[in-house]
């Protein structure tokens, strides 16, 4: 009896184990089936696989982040093609630089005119007469630095090397040469000194009035204002500053400047390097002497102040930066300082600083006519109002030289 029961128990145990295994296998299959159904989500009709072009683009982006791949590409490039690209880039930069320079000069001109009008400065009548369509390129603008007390000097220049009346207009129209006496205004605008200049200007019409208070210690500021104002009024190749006690041969000056017309950033004059004077009370004392080093040092090379010329781009540079250019006690030093930190061509021409007769006379007889003549001992022609006619007679180039000259 017990054996029978034991056999039945064994048979049931076997059957239960078999069904257990089958159930496990079935559950596993069902689980796998539902799992695949959940993860295999149908793709949306709006989605697409990346195209070949997109795949290539991804590849390029990934390679662009790989320095090694970039290096290999650059090495494989044709050297001539690289040089061509460099040359094209250089040309493009030059064109851009010229465009920027032109825009800067136009901006400077507009700014100078606007400031003059806003400040109500007693400028020359030429400013009001100037119209945009009338603007032309001149050879040079010659500004004769003068003072309220220098009426006799001005008259002596009008009687010698500065053409008057219709001849001066002809000089502007045919030769492209502008000549003006340059002066500012007194501390009391509209006073007797200003009225005297206005009356003289009505008679001769040869003044350029500046928005500047006259004073010997303000020559650096006057020089800066002159170049800025002249640049805003006349488009010229060169801008010249000369003192009113110096004799000038205009044709020779023009021929000298024309030789340098194609050069950029030209600064022409008799270059010198005098001592920096730290002692108070002496002439040409430099209050900021300590900026030039130890006692006994000399200034950097700069053109002597009796006569010098700068090219158009340098006049533009002064006009644009006039509010930040530092002024030293001596105006010729100031001008040299403004150019010391930029790429400027300094031209030392000793014909711009000849002595009075017999020096300039001997040179004229030898065929080497001087551009300017004066006495070094007086920083100009000594007693110029009385002696300049004699200098003109013995050292002048002659009126025919001016009208026959071609610039």
Swiss-Prot record:
Chief location bin: Golgi
Superkingdom assignment: Eukaryota
Matching Pfam families: DUF4094, Galactosyl_T
GO cellular-component term (any): Golgi membrane
Localisation: Golgi apparatus membrane
Cofactor(s) listed: Mn(2+)
Molecular functions (GO terms): hexosyltransferase activity
InterPro entries per UniProt: DUF4094, Glyco_trans_31
Pathway: Protein modification; protein glycosylation
TM segment ranges: 13-35
GO biological process, one term: protein glycosylation
Membrane topology recorded in Swiss-Prot or TrEMBL: Single-pass type II membrane protein
Alphabetical keyword list: Glycosyltransferase, Golgi apparatus, Manganese, Membrane, Signal-anchor, Transferase, Transmembrane, Transmembrane helix
Family: Belongs to the glycosyltransferase 31 family.
Function noted in UniProt: Beta-1,3-galactosyltransferase that transfers galactose from UDP-galactose to substrates with a terminal glycosyl residue.
Protein name listed in UniProt: Probable beta-1,3-galactosyltransferase 2
């Amino acid at each position: 009896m017990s054996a029978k029961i034991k056999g039945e128990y064994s048979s049931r145990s076997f059957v239960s184990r078999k069904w257990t295994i089958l159930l496990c296998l079935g559950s596993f299959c069902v689980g796998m089936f539902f799992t695949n159904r959940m993860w295999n989500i149908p793709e949306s009709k709006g989605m697409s696989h990346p195209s070949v072009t997109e795949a290539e683009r991804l590849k390029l982006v990934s390679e662009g982040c790989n320095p090694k791949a970039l290096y290999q590409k650059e090495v494989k490039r044709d050297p001539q093609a690289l040089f061509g690209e460099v040359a094209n880039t250089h040309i493009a930069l030059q064109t851009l630089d010229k465009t920027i320079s032109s825009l800067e000069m136009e901006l400077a001109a507009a700014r100078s005119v606007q400031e003059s009008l806003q400040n109500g400065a007693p400028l020359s009548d030429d400013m009001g007469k100037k119209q945009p369509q009338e603007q032309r390129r001149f050879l040079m603008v010659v500004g004769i630095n003068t003072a309220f007390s220098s009426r006799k000097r001005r008259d002596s220049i009008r009687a010698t090397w500065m053409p008057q009346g219709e001849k001066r207009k002809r000089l502007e129209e045919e030769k492209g040469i502008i000549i003006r006496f340059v002066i500012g205004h007194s501390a009391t605008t509209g006073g007797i000194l200003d009225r005297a200049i206005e009356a003289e200007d009505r008679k001769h019409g040869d003044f350029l009035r500046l928005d500047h208070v006259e004073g010997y210690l303000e020559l650096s500021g006057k020089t800066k204002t002159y170049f800025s104002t002249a640049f805003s009024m006349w488009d010229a190749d060169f801008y010249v500053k000369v003192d009113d006690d110096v004799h000038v041969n205009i044709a020779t000056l023009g021929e000298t400047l024309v030789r340098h017309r194609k050069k950029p950033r030209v600064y022409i004059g008799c270059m010198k390097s005098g001592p920096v004077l730290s002692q108070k009370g002496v002439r040409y004392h430099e209050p900021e002497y300590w900026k030039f080093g130890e006692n006994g040092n000399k200034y950097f090379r700069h053109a002597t102040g009796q006569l010098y010329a700068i090219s158009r781009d340098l006049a533009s540079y002064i006009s644009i930066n006039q509010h930040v250019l530092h002024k030293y006690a001596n105006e010729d030093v100031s001008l040299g300082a403004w150019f010391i930190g930029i790429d400027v061509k300094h031209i030392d021409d000793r014909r711009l600083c000849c002595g009075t007769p017999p020096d300039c006379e001997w040179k004229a007889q030898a065929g080497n006519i001087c551009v300017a003549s004066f006495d070094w001992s007086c920083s100009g022609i000594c007693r110029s109002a009385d002696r300049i006619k004699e200098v003109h007679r013995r050292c002048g180039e002659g009126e025919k030289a001016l009208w026959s000259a071609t610039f």
